[in-house]
Amino acid sequence: MIYMKLIKYLFYIFMLLGVTGVWAQKSDIRLGKLLNNGDWFTLEEEYPMIKDSVQTPMLRLMSEALLGYYFNRPDETITCVDSLLQHYQAELGLGNIASMLLVKSIVEANRGNYAVAADILKDFTSQLREQGVAMDYTQIDEAVQFYDRFRNCPPMSIELPQKNTVIAMSNDSIRLNIKNDTVQRGTSMYVSITVNSKQYKAIFDTGASTTFMSEAFAKKTGVRLIADSLQIHGGITVYGQSGILDSMQIGDIIVRNIPITINKDTTLNKVEDIDLSLIHI
């Protein structure tokens, strides 16, 4: 179970309660539209200009929580989610509460706090089940199981050099080692990485929620398996494995204890000149 882009059932929040004034109402509607559309880059650009005229505090907190998530401001996300859950549970409704808790658990897991991430969701579903609340628990239960498997693993850490460093990147088209293949698959960013003193080429995907390897490459680099029968949710749902890579070097930066998603699909092995499919640090 991996969230490739984040949560699928997001927030339908055109609940502009208590809005006064035409311009204030326009700001709330604009904010709600950007949230519902998942237009995070536009929201990041426009939010500083309209936030003071937004009349619905819940919308402001939700915007800041999700902007913090998508633009790597984890403290901001945690603070805003906690405030939302403390003050606006009735307005949020059960679906949005679940989504906000999933966001919080993902942030904690990204920090390496796997036990905290699992327990946030486990406590939530335990309370609902005790109360006999009927809902689809599948996604949350999968997240709990996933984070539980990493519960005793050390958190990922990054060792930075004492000086500024530049990491070389290149852009190139995606090609498969298939005879007479002419399909256009777009372009990706590529970086050079070092694992176990050997250099490899990797796709650098800023939207990936995990570092992603083929089964063959995971074995080659000595990834320690944590769990089998892992559901991987992307365009389709497939089954793979999860594990930990002890270390990886990118330029002068060393990353340790990296969570890895392993795809058993041999299609990954056909990507031309690529060893590591997706990297997320």
What do these predicted regions represent?
Residues 25-279:
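Pepsin/retropepsin-fold aspartyl endopeptidases
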Residues 1-31:
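Bacterial Sec-dependent N-terminal signal peptides
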